[in-house]
């Protein structure tokens, strides 16, 4: 499974830490960061790369996570979550089949970021009753 990473200038240092962590865990990383672009362009690049192949997940890091979340949720078929704790990262995969998370580097420290990312990439989608919600989300955008 490939993990797509992106960041703006405010999130790049934390993104690099996340990148190293995921590589150590054995994940294939595709880093689409353009440090000279803002969060909107970088979020769109992450989403585009996610949609290019089945099974990809994405992580976008900026200062607070809110902006990239708003961008991602405007895109057809993109279920995204802004997360700042491990449990939410894990559960958004299990219940919402989220394909992207957004993280705020000014909110989340290095160790918490690693735990968030681990929960997100290892969390299985539960399907079943949750698929109804996912279908509803996919119809909205």
Swiss-Prot record:
Alphabetic keyword roster: Isomerase, Lactose metabolism
Gene3D superfamilies associated with the record: Sugar-phosphate isomerase, RpiB/LacA/LacB
GO molecular function: galactose-6-phosphate isomerase activity; ribose-5-phosphate isomerase activity
Description of how the protein assembles with itself and partners: Heteromultimeric protein consisting of LacA and LacB.
Disulfide-bonded cysteines: none
Protein's UniProt keywords contain Transferase: no
Pathway(s) per entry: Carbohydrate metabolism; D-galactose 6-phosphate degradation; D-tagatose 6-phosphate from D-galactose 6-phosphate: step 1/1
Keyword Isomerase: yes
Enzyme Commission number: 5.3.1.26
Gene name linked to the record: lacA1
Record field: catalytic activity: aldehydo-D-galactose 6-phosphate = keto-D-tagatose 6-phosphate
Family (UniProt): Belongs to the LacAB/RpiB family.
Protein name: Galactose-6-phosphate isomerase subunit LacA 1
GO biological process, one term: pentose-phosphate shunt, non-oxidative branch
């Amino acid at each position: 499974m490939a993990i797509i990473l992106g960041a703006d200038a405010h999130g790049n240092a934390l993104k690099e830490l996340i990148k190293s962590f995921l590589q150590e865990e054995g994940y294939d990383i595709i880093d689409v960061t353009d440090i000279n672009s803002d969060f909107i362009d970088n979020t769109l690049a992450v989403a585009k790369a996610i949609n290019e192949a089945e099974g990809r997940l994405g992580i976008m890091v900026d200062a607070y996570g809110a902006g990239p979340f708003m961008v991602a949720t405007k895109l057809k078929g993109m279920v995204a979550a802004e997360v700042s704790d491990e449990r939410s990262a894990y559960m958004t995969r299990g219940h919402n089949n989220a394909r992207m998370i957004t993280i705020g580097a000014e909110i989340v420290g290095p160790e918490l970021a690693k735990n968030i990312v681990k929960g997100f990439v290892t969390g299985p989608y539960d399907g079943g009753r949750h698929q109804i919600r996912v279908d509803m989300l996919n119809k909205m955008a």
